[in-house]
């Protein structure tokens, strides 16, 4: 004969009578770590990424855009600047980005009717330039990150080898090495 014993649950555990409580099993509250918090470790050692070059300045961005423009001209992605275009629409049907080609004279404004400004880049071309610049910047960051990781890994490996050697020397001391031990 099978004998079974059951215990009646108290009201606080009954999910039907206590709608505020979840019918699922309660989880234990996480214990506070006895060791130092991760924030403490972050404060102890300066970040290796603090040494990374700062954000690009406006001059660097302008220089990079000019370099990319020259590359695109070499690849013949840009139309000839002498070809007349309607300033409101490009040949691709996209709006143009207006970039003044030089400084304006003190007596004239940027919207002066003396000179009809033609757009230098289409929206698509600006997108291509920005994409290329972002890719180059990402590649630089990846290279720096890989160098830092490789250095840190080499340091950890050296520390591990030294620790292992010290443990072996402490355990066996000056005993001659044997195949049995």
Curated annotation (Swiss-Prot):
Subcellular location: Nucleus
Protein's UniProt keywords contain Nucleus: yes
Residue interval(s) of motif Nuclear localization signal: 23-28
Chain coiled-coil ranges: none
Molecular function per GO: protein-macromolecule adaptor activity; transcription coregulator activity
Function: Molecular adapter that acts as a bridge between a variety of multiprotein complexes, and which is involved in embryonic development, immunity, myogenesis and brain development. Plays a key role in nuclear protein degradation by promoting import of proteasomes into the nucleus: acts by bridging fully assembled 20S proteasomes with nuclear import receptor ipo9. Involved in both neural precursor maintenance and terminal neural differentiation: bridges gmnn and actl6a/baf53a in neural progenitor cells, antagonizing the activity of gmnn, thereby suppressing sox2 expression.
Subunit structure: Homodimer. Interacts with actl6a/baf53a. Interacts with gmnn.
Recorded family membership: Belongs to the akirin family.
Name of this protein: Akirin-2
Species, as recorded: Xenopus laevis
């Amino acid at each position: 004969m099978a004998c079974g014993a059951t215990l009646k649950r108290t009201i606080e555990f009954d999910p039907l009578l206590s709608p505020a409580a979840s019918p699922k099993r309660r989880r234990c509250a996480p214990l506070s770590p006895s060791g130092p918090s991760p924030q403490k470790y972050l404060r102890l050692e300066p970040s290796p990424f603090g040494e990374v070059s700062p954000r690009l300045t406006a001059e660097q961005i302008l220089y990079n855009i000019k370099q990319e423009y020259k590359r695109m001209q070499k690849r013949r992605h840009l139309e000839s600047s002498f070809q007349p275009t309607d300033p409101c629409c490009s040949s691709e049907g996209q709006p143009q980005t207006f970039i003044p080609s030089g400084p304006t004279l003190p007596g004239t404004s940027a919207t002066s009717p003396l000179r009809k400004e033609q757009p230098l880049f289409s929206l698509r071309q600006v997108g291509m330039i920005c994409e290329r610049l972002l890719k180059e910047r990402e590649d630089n960051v990846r290279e720096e990150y890989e160098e830092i990781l490789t250095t840190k890994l080499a340091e950890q490996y050296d520390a591990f080898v030294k620790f292992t050697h010290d443990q072996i020397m402490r355990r066996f001391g000056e005993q001659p090495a044997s195949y049995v031990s």
